[in-house]
């Protein structure tokens, strides 16, 4: 979470397994120093090429936030979908198989790998919203459209996964219990 007027980092949340603690620590240090998303993009960290990349997910989060601040990427939040004008073109750029498993109402399926083949079918003057699973392919589709003269394009922040969790009935979210391992690889019990 960052302040849109200056990019100051206000908070962070990470969901995952391996390396989450390391990355939250990196983010906490930037927040403690009153840092910005620009600091995230420039953050240096130790890494070994066989085990991680030169650009950490924390750096990538900084790049995404910088693109939003610098207007290189326009996003829309899931709450705003209901307020879109009726003539908005809504495109789900996931694969056909992913789309069949579920989609956001009124979104048509044009996989990102096929988008260039359909550019002449899309009206350049109408607003367009793109989505994918979590945002990366949506960003790629956004760039394809903008670079081909489409002016009113936005990418759904967090993609289909964020929308599906945000709009799911609370009972459905609460009833989903993750599996908790009973022991670690060291034979230590995790359940007391």
Task: Show the residue positions of the predicted features.
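Generic low-polarity alpha-helical segments
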Residues: 1, 191-192
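C-terminal catalytic lobe of FAD-dependent flavoproteins
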Residues: 1-40
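Rhodanese-like catalytic fold shared by cysteine-dependent sulfurtransferases
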Residues: 38-79, 84-89, 96-129, 133-191
């Amino acid at each position: 979470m960052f302040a849109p007027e200056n990019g100051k980092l206000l908070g962070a949340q990470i969901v995952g397994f391996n390396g989450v603690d390391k990355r939250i620590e990196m983010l906490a240090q930037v927040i403690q120093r009153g840092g910005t998303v620009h600091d995230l993009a420039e953050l240096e960290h130790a890494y070994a090429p066989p085990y991680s990349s030169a650009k950490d997910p924390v750096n990538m989060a900084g790049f995404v936030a910088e693109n939003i601040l610098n207007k290189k990427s326009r996003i829309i939040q899931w709450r705003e979908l209901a307020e879109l004008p009726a003539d908005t073109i809504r495109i789900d750029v996931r694969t056909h198989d992913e789309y069949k498993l579920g989609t956001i109402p009124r979104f048509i399926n044009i996989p990102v790998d096929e988008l260039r083949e359909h550019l002449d079918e899309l009206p350049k003057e109408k607003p367009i919203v793109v989505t994918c699973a979590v945002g990366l392919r949506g960003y790629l589709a956004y760039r394809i459209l903008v670079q081909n003269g489409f002016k009113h394009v936005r990418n759904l922040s967090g993609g289909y996964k964020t929308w599906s969790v945000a709009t799911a009935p609370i009972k459905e979210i609460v009833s989903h219990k993750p599996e908790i391992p009973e022991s670690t690889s060291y034979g230590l019990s995790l359940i007391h």
